Curated annotation (Swiss-Prot):
PANTHER family: GLYCEROL-3-PHOSPHATE ACYLTRANSFERASE-RELATED (PTHR30309:SF0), INNER MEMBRANE PROTEIN YGIH (PTHR30309). Catalyzes the transfer of an acyl group from acyl-phosphate (acyl-PO(4)) to glycerol-3-phosphate (G3P) to form lysophosphatidic acid (LPA). This enzyme utilizes acyl-phosphate as fatty acyl donor, but not acyl-CoA or acyl-ACP. Pathway: Lipid metabolism; phospholipid metabolism. This is Glycerol-3-phosphate acyltransferase. One of its GO terms (biological process) is phospholipid biosynthetic process.
Length: 201
């Protein structure tokens, strides 16, 4: 059995590893490499895939979405070699790193893609639940933000119902953070001014 000090150091190391990986601002890197300038200067000022899409480059937005998700997946899977607790710590670190990246003044994305990536790495079946909830909500309401909020709300409930309390607790915390990061979107949804999927601007 590992000593408590070693165990704690391992968890801290996993958290830091995940944070550093999650801090990579792929949206900013890709738009600059494509000659589109600083994505933070357009739209919402966000570095995530939704704002990258506002450049008009769908392929770049898709690449941003995939890479932002893979940050979470990679962090969780690599750390999983040291046990589930390390994987959870690394996944959470990647999520926080995406939200508050050290490289660009701690101003990152809203975390949905990395949330999904961590979910894929820790509980792939939960990722299917997320995808189903997102798609159904998007088809019915046509709001990307609402779809993400509903999907993230369903995940911890689904995980808890399957008896995985540790992961349910992790994603419940992450869901609360996702809601906080989307508070402007929630306000616009309530006011009827949120942009729908496919809308310009």
């Amino acid at each position: 059995m590992a000593e408590p000090g070693f165990f704690n150091a391992m968890l801290i190391g996993a958290l830091i590893f995940g944070y550093v990986l999650g801090s990579i601002p792929f949206g900013l890197i890709l738009t600059r490499l494509a000659g589109l300038g600083d994505v933070r200067a357009i739209g919402s000022g966000n570095i995530g895939a939704t704002n990258v899409l506002r450049t008009g480059n769908k392929k770049l937005a898709a690449a941003t979405l995939i890479l932002d998700a893979l940050k979470g997946t990679a962090a969780a899977l690599i750390a999983a070699h040291f046990g589930q607790n390390a994987a959870i710590a690394a996944g959470f670190g990647a999520f926080i790193g995406h939200l508050f990246p050290v490289w660009i003044g701690f101003k990152g994305g809203k975390g949905v893609a990395t949330y999904l990536g961590v979910l894929i790495g820790l509980a792939w079946a939960g990722a299917l639940v997320f995808a189903a909830a997102w798609i159904v909500t998007a088809l019915l309401a046509r709001y990307s933000s609402l779809s993400a909020l509903v999907a993230s709300l369903v995940v911890p409930i689904a995980l808890y119902s399957r008896g995985n309390q540790a992961l349910a607790a992790l994603f419940a915390i992450m869901t609360v953070i996702v809601f906080i990061k989307h508070r402007a979107n929630i306000s616009r949804l309530l006011n009827g001014t949120e942009s729908k999927i496919g809308a310009k601007g």
